[in-house]
Amino acid sequence: MEHQEHGRFTLADTEDGHIWGVCSAVDGLFGEPARGTYELFDWAPENAETRGWVGDRVWLVPDDDTLDAWLLEDVESLGRHPGTGSLLLTGLDDYEGPPEGHRGSVRVHDQYRWRGSCTELARILPPEENSPPLVLRGLAPSDRLRAALAKGTRRARALEQVALRIRDDQGQPLTERLFWAQVNAWRPSSTGTDLIDLELEGGYSTPIPEHLRPLWERWFAGPPDTPNTWADLDTRRRKAWLDLVRERACQRAHRDRPAGHAYELQGCHVTDEPALYLALGEAVNGAGGYFGGCLEAIRDCLGGAFGYTAPATLLWRDAEVAREHLSQMLTPDGELYDLFAEVLGVLAAGGMHVTLA
């Protein structure tokens, strides 16, 4: 028997939109993503020793001008390798690091400042680990899914690419996760008659980091009622908050305000890049609002469909906070640039007249 969507999680086919099933609990949504580990030989720190969380986007800049910088995301320092002068960094990478056999010095920055340099680096291959399965608990399956499970062949159990749609407690779309799904096993669920526990394997290889569970649970309860709910978060969690703000915005339609609207940005907490975009989003679209997560995205939002119609005005309060923290940023290759000035230029080009206060 087919059903309407209900519950927090909906498993849907990305090709034809068919809903495979709906449930209220998923095991394996949170976990520890696979991370790359790099050893930086003869590490020479700049300013201070690199410890703990390093940055959301850390660039490894080779001394060879013919090579682009390499990116590590959500980077942590494991400290010095015992008995050596090496530093160990771990982070999410795209496996597009140094070419095979690369030898040469590398300088490291986190977009805000240089962290240090090394004479050489190498990627440490991790032990082979299988990704834990994703288990949808108490799933109300569609007739099509029941038929596939009854057939039982591996081909029938291949659901191809699916979207795990996630809703908040009010039933409003929050975000979704795309992956390739193969049914590994299923069994009757203890949560109710005609419900199953569906185990999927293969495609869900990037779980939400466990340390972000409390932040996600805040969003499960619904969007914030007041601006600056994110202000007490550190940069790492501000970035995760921004990711959810952006993903939620992509699930929703936005009504543009008429031209001539006067916006106000509360800038006292704009001490890093995520805070800049969070404050701008809330200035235009209220608490939990989105108006770009990078310069190009701001340009897109200025074009319409994200709550704004040109021309308009923006009063940026406490603008000196952003100027102090964002005017000496580093490009991937390590060149200085003024993000604060860049944002002002993008807003002006989009018909937003900004007054700094």
Give, region by region, the residue ranges found by the protein language model.
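Short glycine-rich, low-complexity/disordered patches
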Residues: 159, 167-172, 290-297, 356-357
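Phosphate/adenylate-binding glycine loop and adjacent helical scaffold
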Residues: 1-231
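Hydrophobic, Leu/Ile/Phe/Ala-enriched alpha-helical segments that form helix-helix packing faces
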Residues: 149-153, 249, 253, 280, ...
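Helix-rich interaction surfaces within compact, conserved domain-sized segments
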Residues: 323-357
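Extended, compositionally biased accessory segments flanking or bridging domains
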Residues: 2-13, 19-26, 224-287
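Conserved helix-adjacent loop modules within structured domains
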Residues: 55, 70, 256-259, 264-313, ...
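Short, glycine-/small-residue-enriched flexible loop/hinge segments at domain edges that mediate gating
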Residues: 312-321
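A generic structural signal for short, non-catalytic loop/turn and secondary-structure boundary residues
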Residues: 157, 191-193, 255-258, 307-309, ...
